[in-house]
Amino acid sequence: MIIVLSPAKSLDYETPPHVKKHTIPDFVDDAAELIGGLRRLSPQDIASLMDISDQLAHLNFQRYADWSPTFDSSNSKQAVLAFNGDVYEGFDAKSLSASDLDYAQQHVRVLSGLYGLLRPLDLLQPYRLEMGTRFENSRGKDLYAFWGARITQALNQQLEKKKGGSRVLINCASTEYFKSVKPKQLSAPVITPVFEDWKGGRYKIISFHAKRARGLMARYLVENRFDTPEQMKAFDSEGYAFDAQASNDSTYVFRRRVAD
């Protein structure tokens, strides 16, 4: 079983990591190529390309200038500890044990516009480059063209290493990021958990809650060491429950109803 997550725009480089163990991203050369292109952009270009404020554009202009193909503790932090958005508040890696992080290192992957595919303990230098950014590059008009089948091939390599249990990919990533994966080329089926909350008289996906829940699900799978997707259905964190009638073989729907 492999679980894929989206990255986060919000980053935490202030809190010291509680583990020293780390690895180096697999696609450093590809990331360096993208950085080379990004360094040719002015802060104004970055603001326009990414639809961000001038302040954020200048911050990322400096990040690209500072980026180095050499990763160490002075310029980097483990990815799952550096990402700090809603998904990662749910995953809460800083409270995972060393053995849980070791398991996550084998079973969790983070999709990234700059780094392609990250393991949880891969060192990460600060950046902003969302997968959906229409950043023209040597391989095409956007980052989907840049990464092509590389991410899918890397996932297949991981899936093929798994012995025992189900060979399945659990998609806890956003639509934007999972578009970088080619499901028809995967060597395993994909199951996507969907999280809905009751609001306005019906169940619907509420972005903030759904992001957090995807992190909660990833943590649940890591902590319980599950090896079949059927076991996912027992997930009940923060009031969610599996809804069999709303689900099918490839989409598991979890719903939560609190007072309006």
UniProtKB/Swiss-Prot annotation:
GO terms for cellular component: cytosol. It comes from the Bacteria. GO terms for biological process: response to hydroperoxide. Pfam families: H2O2_YaaD (PF03883). Coiled coil: none annotated. HAMAP family: UPF0246. Belongs to the UPF0246 family. This is UPF0246 protein Bphy_1979. It comes from Paraburkholderia phymatum (strain DSM 17167 / CIP 108236 / LMG 21445 / STM815) (Burkholderia phymatum).
